[in-house]
Design a protein with these regions (language model features):
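Conserved Walker B
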Residues: 178
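Accessory, often N-terminal, substrate/partner-engagement and coupling regions
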Residues: 1-21
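Conserved ATPase-coupling elements of RecA-like P-loop NTPase cores
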Residues: 182-189
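The Walker A/P-loop phosphate-binding site
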Residues: 16-116, 135, 143
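Catalytic P-loop NTPase motifs of RecA-like helicase/translocase cores
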Residues: 181-182, 220
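Phosphate-binding/switch region of NTP-binding enzymes
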Residues: 53, 108, 191-233
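Cytosolic-facing regulatory segments adjacent to core modules
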Residues: 54, 89-169, 183
């Protein structure tokens, strides 16, 4: 057709300047040459606990970390300690706490900053002390929380996480907890959990963020996990 239309030079040029075609997702090993010497362990943010750092060698980007334990054993408290630790190390944090109000989350974080358990004994600090601690913790640090009530759809949660990472430069997202996202939906809970985790893990790699995800353990027959039941993985 090009020859018929007198476009012989354009045809020759298109042949000699043709670019290599490669389907999406296929890369040559040489494409990773500049990445191979990067020490991911050396660039990782630490956990607030030394034993975790020894085992996990830090908190890495592009990872999905699951926190699992029985009811009432401190999963949410652990997450608050982690959030405070990340903020104190100048990390930008996103919080999606689906089981409690943002006010309670922020009061708990302020209490950690003041070394007081304000969620149990609010009278440990005056209103002025609480506000002073709040301003000292959040005044020049980045922490965004999802106003979530009425919102328990995994696709919506993924959209908000994407916005946090792209538009707000969030590096770490704490999701507490994944179980509530699938409990309100109909269908095979195991399949929905697998699908939700796949979407979250994909976001970690795509956006270069870490997601710390809390999960309840399925209650076995007899004793619960909080009473010493063994965990089956």
């Amino acid at each position: 057709q090009a020859i018929v239309e007198g476009k012989r030079s354009e045809l020759v040029q298109s042949i000699w300047q043709a670019q290599e075609f490669r389907p999406d997702g296929l890369k040559s090993a040489t494409d990773y040459r500049s990445d191979i010497t990067i020490d991911e362990a050396a660039s990782a943010i630490t956990w607030p606990y030394s034993q975790l750092n020894e085992i996990l060698r830090g908190l890495h980007r592009e990872t999905l970390t699951t926190i699992a334990a029985g009811s009432g054993l401190g999963k949410s408290t652990f997450c608050k300690e982690l959030i405070h630790h990340l903020l104190m190390h100048d990390q930008k944090v996103g919080v999606i706490a689906l089981e409690e109000s943002n006010k309670r989350t922020l009061l708990g974080l302020t209490g950690i900053h003041l070394s007081k358990n304000l969620l149990v004994e609010r009278e440990q600090a005056t209103d002025e002390e609480v506000l002073e601690g709040f301003d000292d913790l959040f005044g020049d640090r980045t922490c965004y929380l999802l106003d979530h009530f009425g919102s328990s759809d995994i696709d919506m949660i993924c959209q908000r996480i994407r916005f946090m990472a792209v538009s707000l430069s969030i590096s770490h997202v704490i999701l507490d907890h994944i179980s509530i996202l699938v409990s309100a939906q109909e269908g095979d809970e195991r399949r929905m959990l697998d699908a939700a985790c796949t979407k979250l893990r994909t976001l970690c790699s795509e956006l270069g963020i870490s997601i710390i995800m809390v999960s309840h353990l399925k209650r076995p027959d007899g004793r619960g996990h909080e009473d010493g039941a063994r965990v089956s993985l």
